[in-house]
Amino acid sequence: MPHLLEMKNITKAFGAVKAVDNVSLTLEAGQVLSLCGENGSGKSTLMKVLCAIYPHGSYDGQIIFSGDELRANHIRDTEQKGIAIIHQELALVKEMTVLENMFLGNEWTRFGVMDYDNMYLRCQRMLEQVKLAVDPNTKVGELGLGQQQLVEIAKALNKQVRLLVLDEPTASLTERETGILLEIIQDLRDHGIACIYISHKLNEVKAISDVICVIRDGKHIGTRPAAELSEDHIIAMMVGRELTELYPNEPHVIGEEVLRVEHLTAWHPVNRHIRRVDDVSFALHRGEILGIAGLVGSGRTETVQCLFGAYRGRWQGDIFIDGKPVTISNCQQAMAQGIAMVPEDRKKDGIVPVMGVAQNMTLAALDQFTGPLSMLDDAREQDIIRQSLANLKVKTSSPELAIARLSGGNQQKAVLAKCLLLNPRILILDEPTRGIDIGAKYEIYKLINALVKQHIAVIVISSELPEVLGLSDRVLVMHQGRIKADLINRDLTQEQVMEAALRSEHRAENIAV
């Protein structure tokens, strides 16, 4: 019986650079293959070749699908064959309904009139297949990201998909939404639909995959049954070396208190009867990494947004720096007090995509490069930019390159460089490694550790508990806007943190574990 998919000796070059170099892979019907590799390894390029985003003739090699050679010139050609790709950036029209999105460009007609009734019934059936209980007439923009992801899958099922490519599908999803998505993929597998799954989250890769294919520097490193590979083996194949200690295991010299927060309360920006943060108090010390853990909606992000003057709703409470009360009503006041923040949503709040890397890095610190008569000191600015790029190992062909063209890891390091140009005493990192590969994560962890050695106090928020536990000296556990526990991190486990988050008492507990 032939394979569902064979990609034979695929090579795709851009000028003299081979983004994909002689890569071959096979896939069976009803099989889940995870494609792993660092950013820039060639994964996305290979999938764009498969889906004819790069058309036949623009690459070398051969693609066989369901026994026939695939010579597609447009993504519509591959969709007609039963191949669909869902990108991390969803291709839905937010102002249109679920039904309108599902049939966009493929509307059903009867006697020359839109067959709305049958489209509605079909849409309902497709939504039921992905376990999404929403009315087809709901505007897509009113749905959460997890629900939108399921609409994309339902849309693919409506096109009789036989092979579904999912590129970083859970990067912006909650743990619950991720669990639902993985269940849907298992259901698709049981119905004979094959999946190619691209993710940096190796726990998901291990949980969902039948086979794992690793690509590094455009080359095929190996394809093995998932059961034969540990996460450490996958990492070693991806980066070409073993990361024996993902989190820097170095003791921190914790100094005096630099920040104290007392009775911080923040209300929902629209529904002012709801408290997003409820009477939160804590302290932070020089040279300390304070992790904040909790389920999505626990109030973690809202807490640090208040500290940085970025919260859009009403809040109250007292903030002390070096024991002195300070007023922080906006980001400028926070930066003046020595606070810098890497935001949760890098693309929305951290960068200006159309501007160059250098412009993004210096945007918040232009006064440092302003000389007499308010003239910009270009030479000094360029010198500091070069130094920052080198120190943080930001890979870019030019400081003037649009930052949107960098990989996620390099964008994040550029945002971090922007913060460090402010010479902060307190650095807030909200989801610092979201959507970036394991090698870039390792570099960012080393950077955080180096900053702490310079006596900078760091607050880390992450939805990945291993990250919080691997980095932090102390962990605040939040639930429903309140601090449920303040835990000293001595071999602290994920189970202990989750138990604290779900504990019914509303008082904070100081626990040394």
Swiss-Prot record:
It is found in: Cell inner membrane. GO terms for molecular function: ABC-type D-xylose transporter activity; ATP binding; ATP hydrolysis activity. The keyword Nucleotide-binding applies. It comes from the Bacteria. The keyword Secreted does not apply. It catalyses: D-xylose(out) + ATP + H2O = D-xylose(in) + ADP + phosphate + H(+). CDD domains: ABC_Carb_Monos_I, ABC_Carb_Monos_II. PANTHER family: CARBOHYDRATE TRANSPORT ATP-BINDING PROTEIN MG119-RELATED, XYLOSE IMPORT ATP-BINDING PROTEIN XYLG. The complex is composed of two ATP-binding proteins (XylG), two transmembrane proteins (XylH) and a solute-binding protein (XylF). This is Xylose import ATP-binding protein XylG. It comes from Pectobacterium atrosepticum (strain SCRI 1043 / ATCC BAA-672) (Erwinia carotovora subsp. atroseptica). The lineage of its organism: Bacteria, Pseudomonadati, Pseudomonadota, Gammaproteobacteria, Enterobacterales.
